[in-house]
């Protein structure tokens, strides 16, 4: 459905930025369980301070880009990083274009 729109929208984000974000998503998914386990150890007050400190050091040695906070929400169509609706994963501009083309059911241009 959206592959037709890519040709019509001129302003695409740089492919390097999109690829960098995709790499971060893959890294985050790969290290998710390991990071979660280490954070659980760090937050556990019943463990000794030494064990918690070792877990903190292991966590800091993991790649920075494996942290979920480093991922940027981007538009799936244009790659635009700002003005992205989380549920739709589409930027406000792409959403407007799709709506005007009649590709989103029930969405019409308002008039009053």
Language model segments and positions:
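Intrinsically disordered, Lys/Arg-rich N-terminal extensions and targeting peptides
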Residues: 2-85, 97, 104-112
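Short cysteine/histidine-rich metal-coordination sites, predominantly Zn2+-binding motifs
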Residues: 90-99
């Amino acid at each position: 459905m959206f592959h037709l729109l890519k040709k019509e929208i001129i302003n695409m984000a740089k492919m390097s930025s999109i690829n960098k974000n995709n790499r971060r998503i893959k890294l985050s998914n790969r290290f998710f369980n390991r990071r979660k386990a280490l954070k659980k150890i760090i937050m556990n007050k019943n463990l000794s301070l030494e064990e918690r400190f070792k877990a903190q050091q292991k966590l800091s040695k993991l790649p920075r880009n494996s942290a979920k906070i480093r991922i940027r929400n981007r538009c799936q169509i244009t790659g635009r990083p700002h003005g992205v609706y989380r549920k739709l994963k589409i930027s406000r501009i792409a959403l407007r274009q799709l709506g005007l083309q009649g590709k989103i059911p029930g969405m019409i241009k308002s008039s009053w």
